[in-house]
Curated annotation (Swiss-Prot):
This is Mycinamicin III 3''-O-methyltransferase. Keywords: Antibiotic biosynthesis, Magnesium, Metal-binding, Methyltransferase, S-adenosyl-L-methionine, Transferase. The lineage of its organism: Bacteria, Bacillati, Actinomycetota, Actinomycetes, Micromonosporales. It catalyses: mycinamicin III + S-adenosyl-L-methionine = mycinamicin IV + S-adenosyl-L-homocysteine + H(+). Pathway: Antibiotic biosynthesis; mycinamicin biosynthesis. It is an enzyme of class 2 (transferase). InterPro entries: SAM-dependent_MTases_sf, TylF_MeTrfase. It comes from Micromonospora griseorubida. O-methyltransferase that catalyzes the conversion of mycinamicin III to mycinamicin IV in the biosynthesis of mycinamicin, a 16-membered macrolide antibiotic. The keyword S-adenosyl-L-methionine applies. The gene is mycF. Disruption phenotype: No production of mycinamicin II and accumulation of mycinamicin III. Belongs to the methyltransferase TylF/MycF family. Gene3D superfamilies: Vaccinia Virus protein VP39. PANTHER family: MACROCIN O-METHYLTRANSFERASE.
Length: 254
């Protein structure tokens, strides 16, 4: 059924805009992608590297983010929204738009990123991260996006205000002292074992019961390893639900 209310129409259009289903920009050529073209199925599933769009997570994961935020609001789950790994900011822009659409004034969207792309590999990194060496993809898919650029993107949507706060830096440095108290939605998009584990270790304990943990890169073995290692260590048995071929989420029961 098509959207009908003003809120539904706004959020549907906002999703289409941050993912650029409107003007349908081509993808970067990288990895398994050999042609610079817009492919609707790939954009729907977040399986391309947009040249212009403000998010690469695709429509299915945007729908999931909307489901999680709206469910938290409906059920009165206390806390803010945090995304770790934001690229051009599109998913966080959409999250702020959801709060705006429902006139929610007591929650914050936290935008955490290095704003430098992936870090260089060091001797301290997990072996699976060293093998992937994600740093090599920074330029190929235009990953490094400055804080100023992300802030400007928020401003273009009319959504840069005091309910948006930025946490620039590597997660191992920013997460231990991040100033949020409670989270209703925790969206992790760091790709690597290290980034995922840093966020789970320091942010997941602040996720409220009934809140949502979203893992954008569960399809990546290093990320999946961190997720299961953390869940096993802390006895987390909440059902992992598949979003698409890449992402999953679960709802925290306790």
């Amino acid at each position: 059924m098509s959207p009908s209310t003003g809120v539904e129409l706004y959020l549907d259009l906002l999703k289409r805009t941050v993912s650029n289903f409107i003007y349908q920009d081509a993808t970067h050529v990288a990895g398994l992608i050999t042609e610079a073209a817009f492919v609707e199925e790939a954009r729907e599933s977040g399986e391309d590297y947009p040249t212009v769009a403000h998010t690469m997570i695709g429509m299915k994961r945007l729908n999931n983010l909307q489901h999680c935020v709206e469910s938290a609001l409906r059920d009165g789950v206390p806390g803010d929204v945090l995304e770790t790994g934001v690229w051009r900011g599109g998913a966080c822009i959409f999250a702020r738009g959801i709060l705006k659409a429902y006139d929610v004034r007591d929650r914050t969207v936290w935008v955490a990123d290095s704003f430098q792309g992936f870090p260089k590999i060091t001797d301290d990194d997990h072996p699976m991260d060293a093998e992937m060496n994600l740093h090599q993809y920074n330029e190929a898919v235009d990953l490094p996006t400055s804080l100023a650029t992300v802030q400007r993107n928020f401003s273009r949507y009319g959504l840069l205000d005091d309910q948006v706060r930025f946490l620039p830096g590597w997660f191992k440095d920013t997460m231990p002292t991040a100033p949020f108290e409670r989270l209703a939605v925790l969206r992790m998009d760091g790709d690597s074992y290290g980034a995922t584990m840093d966020v789970l270790t320091h942010a997941y304990p602040r996720l409220s019961p009934g809140g949502f943990a979203i893992i954008d890169d569960y399809c990546i073995p290093a990320c999946r390893e961190a997720v299961h290692e953390y869940r096993d260590r802390h006895g987390i048995s909440d059902e992992i639900v598949e979003i698409d071929r890449q992402g999953v989420y679960w709802r925290r029961s306790a």
